[in-house]
Design a protein with these regions (language model features):
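Flexible loop/turn segments at secondary-structure boundaries
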Residues: 24, 67-68, 82-85, 94, ...
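Intrinsically disordered, low-complexity, positively charged segments
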Residues: 13-39
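N-terminal capping segment at the start of a domain
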Residues: 1-16, 170
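Soluble metallo-hydrolase cores and metallopeptidase-like ectodomains found primarily
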Residues: 18, 54-60, 66-68, 129-130, ...
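A generic, well-ordered mixed alpha/beta core segment in the N-terminal half of proteins
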Residues: 72-159
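Acidic/His- and Gly-rich active-site-bordering loop/insert found
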Residues: 31-33, 37-87
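Conserved small/polar residues in nucleotide/adenosyl-binding loops
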Residues: 237-241
Length: 241
């Protein structure tokens, strides 16, 4: 069970991916996806259904064997997102030495200090042109290699680092993406990463920059979930604070 949980967490760093993975599991276990805009049709005891909304939430239910007035019903709720940093549009910020950082905004209420000095990556969704110009397509993206880092200054530049330092959401937690090596990369580094990932993971597709209409991407922990302790009784998952 714990291995299945850790595998699910590794595959679900953001809500879009969590919803897809939950939907796949439900479908494999006899649940039927429904469209809330269409009639449900005949329903009988034991039938199982699920519906998704905006690719970011999912609702599953099973029809009971007794009337609700007699047996009542049970409800279980959980959220499938977690505090993180959302990548802003036109996010690339070129700094001294050709270093590129990404401009972000806080999503939720993260404990910002826990995001420093660890390998991070990107996950979310990318909207691309569809065959019908009026029907764009949404693709999920999860870059599984370490890609970014939010770095602390060396201690001789920040002697108060161990005394508790107020962090600016606009300045101190901008992740480093890399260094441009040619003028052609200026302003295109993030897009190149997105296109490389899409073209390497989606068969028979060759996207270019003009195909990408928008994206909704977030920072995610690149460290795999694991267990630890003498008896492996404690689990380390991902940044969720």
């Amino acid at each position: 069970m714990i291995k299945r949980l850790l595998s699910f967490l590794d595959a679900s760093p953001v809500n879009f991916l969590a919803v897809k993975n939950i939907a796949d599991t439900l479908a494999a276990n006899g649940f039927r996806r429904i469209d809330p805009a269409l009639p449900l049709g005949e329903v009988k005891s034991g039938d199982r259904f699920f519906v998704t909304k905006n690719d970011s939430s999912i609702y599953a239910f099973r029809i009971g064997n007794k009337p609700i007035a007699d047996a009542g019903f049970h409800m279980i709720c959980a959220h499938c997102d977690s505090p993180t940093f959302r990548i802003k549009p036109n996010a690339e910020m070129l700094t001294e030495g050709g270093i590129v950082k990404l401009n972000t905004e806080v999503y939720g209420g993260p404990i910002m200090s826990t995001w420093f000095d660890r390998p991070l990556t990107l996950a979310g969704r990318v909207i691309v042109r569809g065959e019908d110009v009026m029907q764009p397509e949404t693709l999920l993206l999860h870059i599984k290699r370490p890609l970014l880092q939010i770095s602390n200054l060396a201690i001789h530049f920040n002697r108060q680092v161990n005394d508790g330092v107020a962090l600016s959401k606009q300045k101190d937690v901008l992740p480093l993406l890399g260094q441009i090596t040619s003028q052609l990369e200026a302003g295109n580094l993030l897009m190149n990463v997105i296109l490389e990932e899409l073209n390497s993971t989606i068969a028979d597709c060759q996207f270019c920059a003009k195909d990408v209409l928008d994206f909704d991407l977030y920072l995610a922990d690149a460290t795999p979930a694991c267990t630890f302790g003498v008896h492996n009784a404690v689990s380390y998952t991902h940044l969720t604070l």
